[in-house]
Swiss-Prot record:
Alphabetical list of PANTHER family matching this protein: GLUTAMATE-1-SEMIALDEHYDE 2,1-AMINOMUTASE, GLUTAMATE-1-SEMIALDEHYDE 2,1-AMINOMUTASE 1, CHLOROPLASTIC-RELATED
Stated name of the protein: Glutamate-1-semialdehyde 2,1-aminomutase
Family: Belongs to the class-III pyridoxal-phosphate-dependent aminotransferase family. HemL subfamily.
Gene: hemL
GO molecular function, one term: pyridoxal phosphate binding
Species: Neisseria gonorrhoeae (strain NCCP11945)
Amino acid sequence: MNRNEILFDRAKAIIPGGVNSPVRAFGSVGGVPRFIKKAEGAYVWDENGTRYTDYVGSWGPAIVGHAHPEVVEAVREAALGGLSFGAPTEGEIAIAEQIAEIMPSVERLRLVSSGTEATMTAIRLARGFTGRDKIIKFEGCYHGHSDSLLVKAGSGLLTFGNPSSAGVPADFTKHTLVLEYNNIAQLEEAFAQSGDEIACVIVEPFVGNMNLVRPTEAFVKALRGLTEKHGAVLIYDEVMTGFRVALGGAQSLHGITPDLTTMGKVIGGGMPLAAFGGRKDIMECISPLAGVYQAGTLSGNPIAVAAGLKTLEIIQREGFYENLTALTQRLANGIAAAKAHGIEFAADSVGGMFGLYFAAHVPRNYADMARSNIDAFKRFFHGMLDRGIAFGPSAYEAGFVSAAHTPELIDETVAVAVEVFKAMAA
């Protein structure tokens, strides 16, 4: 009896779509989602008892591996002291200090419970600071599900965006301009036309939601230069990349100092925790110091903070990122080398994050990614899953390696990929 099928049917009878986040439903790959019963190290087990080598990593947070004993113990100790207080704690000061020490761009920081809250508030803060309404985002970049950011590109080069979700009024998105990622000419034209109306530019400094896409060095410099020139706020959305691609996030690799940074995933160690921070003069526009409002009952939850503090301690140990980066490169390069004749395939990685593309080349923007062979990805995904390897159930999602993976485990994964590619080419 397949417990996954039974649970999915049961879930669909009470939870819309049977899941609490759409990608989990396997809608883009077909089949029945795996209901996870437990996780440890580099593995997850479904309700049938089947073990999978996991490259989803809870979509990024599990950088030290699942159920790391030190993180679990930190959570246990914190829970014994109470689950939630709705009051300030020393732990939230400590984690803010830790993050600020690691990321010099963060002069002040506020904790929240989700990446969506972080980006939503960063946008509000940028608008409050500048007194402007318009924002720029890039096609294929995901910044959570707040109304002003659920926007797809308009029909013309520099038209303001249209809602990408039902239930979002057009008036909410009329101030959002959607441009092509890595397109400097569009960015320059947008500022030439509307520079004194643009409050901020929000960007994934390495994109993870149209698979892994790198920015060009020139694009990064243009982002910083144009926002500075026109008095707009540059927001680095490092919810995914923060502490994942490098200890100091993407901004440390780019040599860029953003005005605001949003972060999440890794900083909670697997618990619901996120943050936004940056320049003191911008951050001090927020309540209770000034008029930009933000609040949250569970913001700075002591259990999540305890998990985050222990995770931050672990990832700062000697050799952590060198090992993580080497493992991730070994995986990406190994799978790319394993591709069968006649199958277009490319791979890339940065830090502990990787992208697998059924395309001739690594994509540079959403249009490139949209031209990849989605049907081939579906076959690859299920071929790997049936053999005990779990990747994200969408061609548009990046993958993640943890410190719990080993070279031997990576090589086993590559060997399975060889089998799957051969089956696909047959």
